[in-house]
Amino acid sequence: PNQKAKLELMATEAFLLFAQDLSGGILNPNMIDVNINVVPYRKDTNMLLASLTENLDVNSFFDEHIPSSNEYNALVTELRKLREISRNEYWGDLVPADVPLEVGMTHDNVPLLRKRLSKMGYPVYQTHPRLFDEELDAAVKKFQEFHGLNPDGVFGKRSIEAINVPPKTRLVQVLVNLERMRWNN
């Protein structure tokens, strides 16, 4: 009986730590950098236990304690995609940074750009593989906007740097941003 009680206490403690990590993050921001002035909100364990006993549905309990913003949910969706991509494939060959690409140009780098954008989920159909056409321009603008770049359609140095980031690096960036959002939950 004593062993069973000890196991139950350990399971409860692990459950509460997990709930706190979900709601307030895993890492202490000051351990990463002393200049980070964020104090994550840690939910009181008594409040968490009371919340669980009121609502015996564990899924609802966790839903109640994780960040619920659209941005957080979008990052979780992106994380799932990136995990799948990182396991099974990559985004194609890198786009060389030798020349900026824009509408109306014909260049050997355009097929690489089309392929990489397509693998990243931006629909781009090939009418003339080497031609940077209006359709490719629309996909480039969406890519630029999604990555916080000026959506001007010119695929220059910053856009090329952004598209050439490997999926595993993007995955780490998403994980870091999810953690930051939990700190502010």
Which role does the model predict for each range below?
Residues P1-N185:
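Auxiliary tRNA-acceptor-end handling modules of aminoacyl-tRNA synthetases
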